[in-house]
A protein has these predicted regions:
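Active-site catalytic loop in hydrolytic enzyme cores
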Residues: 67, 80, 99-179, 192-201, ...
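CN hydrolase (nitrilase-like) catalytic-core segments centered on the catalytic cysteine
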Residues: 67-90, 158, 164-253
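A short C-terminal boundary segment appended to hydrolase-like catalytic domains
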Residues: 260-279
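N-terminal active-site segment of His-dependent metallophosphoesterases
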Residues: 1-40, 185
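Cys-nucleophile CN-hydrolase/nitrilase-fold catalytic domain and related Cys-dependent amidase chemistry
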Residues: 19, 27-114, 120-122, 191-206
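Beta-strand-turn-beta hairpins that frame and shape the catalytic cleft
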Residues: 1-8, 151-160, 183
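Residue-level recognition of beta-strand->loop/alpha-helix junctions
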Residues: 12-14, 44, 122, 218
C-alpha cells in the first residue's frame, strides 16, 4: 500500500568552486532538514561543485549501487549522509563518469538510508543557450546526455528524477507520470535571467499537466565566473499551487506531502486518462 504522506525538504545552496566547503554545507543543511522531519532531502544541481567545467571533469565518479573502493568523495558523502540521518537523499546533478572522459554525465542519484544508490538518472536535455546575461552556456561541450527516464522509490512512494533544464520538456514529466510517479524532483541551477520569468511558471505547469507534486531544489546567489542563480526552492502541489518556498539565501524548505491529493486531483480532472492519439 502506498503511504499517504511523505515529508520532503528542498535544500537551497550557493555552491562555489570548493568541493570541501560545498559538501560541508550539504551535510549541515541536510542534517538540519532530517532533524526537522524530512524523509526525503533533495539537493540542487551542482551541489558539490560550481567551478570550471575542466575541474568538474576531474571530479567525475562511477555511480554504483553498493559502496565501493571506487567511490569518489561526492558519493561517499551522500552515502554517509543517508546512513547518518536515516533519510533518502537525492543528489541532483553530480558528475558521473561516461565512456567519453571529456564529457561525464550530469547525474541525479537517489541514495537510500542504508547507503545504497537505488536509482540514478542521467540528465537528458543539455543547456545549450544564450539568454542575454553575459554568459554562454554550452553544456553539451562538457557533458554527455542521458537517454532514459527514471522513477525511483522512496518509502513506497514513486518519485521521478529530473535535472534543471529538463523542466522545459513536458513530455518527460508525462513519461514519469505514466511510469507511476506521484512526486517529481527538480534539482536546478536556474540562471537569474531565466528564473525570474520562467521558474515558477514552468514548475506549476509541470505539476498541473502531470498532476503530481513537484519538489524543486535550487542554487542561489553568486558563483565563480560571474554566474548568478535564481534560488526560490519550492514545493508545488498537483493543482499547481506553491505550498512552500525557501527564503533568499542558503537554507531549506520543508513540507509534508499529502499524497491523497494526487488521487483527488487525478479523479476530479482526469486529464491523464483523457489523452487521445493526435495525427
Amino acid at each position: 500500500m502506498t503511504p499517504q504522506e511523505l515529508t520532503v525538504a528542498a535544500v537551497q545552496l550557493e555552491s562555489q568552486a570548493s568541493l570541501d566547503d560545498n559538501l560541508e554545507a550539504v551535510t549541515r543543511l541536510s542534517r538540519r532538514a532530517a532533524t526537522s522531519g524530512a524523509e526525503l532531502v533533495v539537493l540542487p544541481e551542482n551541489f558539490a561543485y560550481m567551478g570550471s567545467e575542466e575541474d568538474k571533469r576531474e571530479l567525475a565518479e562511477p555511480v554504483l549501487v553498493e559502496a565501493s573502493p571506487s567511490d569518489g568523495p561526492i558519493l561517499c558523502a551522500l552515502r554517509a549522509l543517508a546512513r547518518d540521518t536515516g533519510a533518502f537523499i537525492i543528489g541532483g546533478g553530480m558528475p558521473e563518469r561516461s565512456a567519453d572522459p571529456e564529457r561525464p554525465f550530469n547525474t541525479s542519484v537517489l541514495v537510500a538510508p542504508d547507503g545504497r544508490v537505488t536509482a540514478s538518472y542521467r540528465k537528458i536535455h543539455l543547456f545549450d543557450v544564450s539568454v542575454g546575461d553575459g554568459q554562454l552556456y554550452r553544456e553539451s561541450a562538457s557533458t554527455s546526455a542521458g537517454e532514459r527516464s527514471v522513477v525511483g522509490d522512496v518509502r513506497g512512494v514513486p518519485v521521478g528524477l529530473t535535472v534543471c533544464y529538463d523542466l522545459r520538456f513536458p513530455e518527460l514529466f508525462r513519461k514519469l507520470a505514466d511510469g507511476g510517479a506521484r512526486v517529481a524532483t527538480v534539482p536546478a541551477a536556474f540562471t537569474l535571467m531565466t528564473g525570474k520569468d520562467h521558474w515558477h511558471v514552468l514548475l506549476r505547469a509541470r505539476a498541473i499537466e502531470s498532476q503530481m507534486f513537484v519538489v524543486a531544489a535550487a542554487q542561489c546567489g553568486r558563483h565563480p565566473r560571474g554566474r548568478m542563480t535564481y534560488g526560490k526552492s519550492c514545493v508545488i502541489d498537483p493543482w499547481g499551487d506553491v505550498i512552500a518556498q525557501a527564503s533568499d539565501g542558503p537554507g531549506f524548505v520543508l513540507r509534508a506531502l499529502d499524497l491523497g491529493r494526487v488521487d483527488a486531483v487525478r479523479e476530479s480532472l482526469p486529464c491523464l486518462t483523457h489523452r487521445r492519439p493526435i495525427g
